[in-house]
Each structure stands twice: as C-alpha cells, then as structure tokens.
Amino acid sequence: MKKFITLSLLLAVGFANAQAFKGKGDVKFNLGVNIQDGGSGIGISSDFGLGENMSYGFAASYLLSASSDDLGNKPEFGDRIDAKFRFNANLGNVFQLDKKMDIYPGLDLGLRNFGAHLGFRYFFTEGFGIFTEAGIPIASYKTSPVGFDKLNNQFVFNIGASFNL
C-alpha cells in the first residue's frame, strides 16, 4: 500500500508541474510522423522560447515511403528531405488553456516554400507530452510544382511525442 501511495503522489506532482510553454528560455523538441499525399516519413522540430508568447525554431522531415511517379521513378534523397526555419505565437495562456496545453500558429521559411502551420501540445509530465501540427505552403518557390516537387510542398500533418529540454 505504501508503494501505491508513493507512486500516486509522484505521478500527481509530475502532472501538476507539467507545462506546455513557459516562455523565454523554454526549449521543446518534437519527434513524430509526417503524413502527406504521396508519402509518409519522420519529422523533427525544436522550438526556443523568446518571450512569454513567442518562439522560433527549426523543423526537418524525411519521407521514408514516397510514391513513384507515372513512369515508375522513385524520388531521390533531395526530393524526400525538407528543412525549415519557423516562428511561433504560443497562445495557450492567451486563450487561458490549462498550463499543460499550448496552441501555436506560426510561419515557416523552408527549402521549398514559405508556409504556415498550426500546432497543439499537451504535456502529461514535466518532460513528456504529445503534439500535432498541420502545415500548408503559402508561396511555393516554383510557380507550378509538378512531380516530386510536390513532395514537402503541400498540406502536411504531423503527430508525435514532445519533449521539454
């Protein structure tokens, strides 16, 4: 019984201290699945707090499974990878969400486009949570992307684990 009570108290303290975004000096790391039309893969991102409601960061993705084109050609490494610089507005406290939750719209400047994303984080403990993000290109660097240029240059959905560093 003592072990059960001790474990319950430790978990309660961990859940009570969980916080999705703390502000300046906060560092988050996300690791998840990248899902889009024509392929799926892995995505990582990291965000660094600048102020109470602002952060900047970096994101990268690599498509592990990507569809062949009409001629049977497979995308090369350069077609499968993407990297972006991002800026977020962390609005969890603005919307008076629980401290374990954060919603963050943002802008991306990447290898293939200028885009936007909307994300949500929920932390179960001080160091571990889940996240989900949806992103869209606003302006592609190629006026009419065709073939493999469409990979990483379209609506994308990410879901995975979030870590407080």
Q: Model regions: which residues?
A:
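N-terminal, post-signal-peptide region of Sec/Tat-exported proteins
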Residues: I44-D82
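Transmembrane beta-strands of outer-membrane beta-barrel pores
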Residues: L31-D37, A60-A66, A89-N93, L109-N113, ...
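Solvent-exposed loop/turn segments connecting transmembrane beta-strands
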Residues: N30-I42, G106-H117, S144-Q154
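Predominantly the C-terminal beta-signal and adjacent terminal strand-loop region
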Residues: A59, L63-L71, R121-L165
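Short loop/turn motifs that connect adjacent beta-strands in outer-membrane beta-barrel proteins
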Residues: Q19-K24, E52-N53, G92-I103, F124-F128
